[in-house]
Amino acid sequence: MFEVALLYPDKQQGAAKRYGMPQDMSKDLNLSVILRAMAKEDEEIFTNCQRVLLCPVTDEKTLHFRQQMVSDAVSHPEFYEEMYRIAKEAMQEIHKYTSKKTSNKVVQITESLDLLRILLKYLRYLKEHLRSEQAEKADAMYLFTTKFREHFTDDFAKDLERHIDDMAVLMQGGRLILTAGVAGGLKCGDAMVNRLDPVDYRKMGKFRRTLRWLLLHLASPEAILLNQEALKQDAIRMEENGLLYTQEIYREFLYQFQEFFSQLQIQVGFYVGCANLGRSLHNLKNENMLSACEP
């Protein structure tokens, strides 16, 4: 849905193979010192920067692309830091959701709707951030910003929010209108199925018979009373199949959003690390500590 391509201009992160014997190389180059300066005590940035630095870049196009991105990040660190914060908080919400274990499909769908609403909020935060004055100055981010705006339009956000609201009402006990077959030979046209226990009409008192007639003909003309156990079971299975299908739709949505925010956190995190390293080197230079290292 939304592609992140901030490390490779034509690929997602992770396409390149790692160097051979990465642990030995990291030790020989003393990368841990550089990585700590990049991470600023953020373990995720430490891990992501280590992962990126140990994957070689050989083609000239990617090298120029990375140079532009790093230059942007060093010049406008606050812009990249805010993007990283948005992605990190969104991933924290996703981890809260995935840590919950329940077999109840209604609960799963309800929680999926809640998470979608939260992620929609973070997508809007990101869109507003990409409209800021800082975004205008970050030239290397232009392609990403343009593509994101093309995919995440205001209409898309409104449609998704409206769909979430409609499904939330349904999960809280709203009515689902069906046009389908309930059982062999029984067709429903725009009807709501009510799972009611079978009753013997002849044993009802006059008041109950009147109440039943009002229910069927006045109060709920769309209702079909399932007075046979086989029909009830068919309706239950149909409802369960509908929930399973709905669950799969939301699972796919959530997977795409999770992949987007995960890649955004990893890739923007690398440039935040570069900005942190640039600050550290600048501070060392101001303190005249780098002059001692000059030949």
Where on the chain are the PLM-derived regions?
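Conserved NTPase motor "head" modules and their coupling/switch loops across ABC/AAA+ ATPases, GTPases
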Residues: M1-K11, G20, Q267-P295
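Conserved amphipathic alpha-helical "coupling/scaffold" segments
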Residues: M1-L176, A180-G185
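Short, solvent-exposed segments of well-ordered alpha helices
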Residues: S103-V106, T110, Q233, Y255-Q258
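Amphipathic alpha-helix face/heptad-repeat signature
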Residues: E111-L115, G242, F260, L264-Q267
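Charged/polar positions within long, soluble alpha-helices
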Residues: R124-R131, A191-P198, L226, G273-N276, ...
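Structured, charged N-terminal subsegments at the starts of enzyme catalytic cores
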Residues: Q172-Q228
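Extended, charged coiled-coil "arm/hinge" scaffolds of SMC/Rad50-like chromosome-maintenance ATPases
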Residues: E222-R251, Q258
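Intracellular alpha-helical coupling/juxtamembrane segments of multi-pass membrane proteins
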Residues: F253, F257-V268, C274-A275
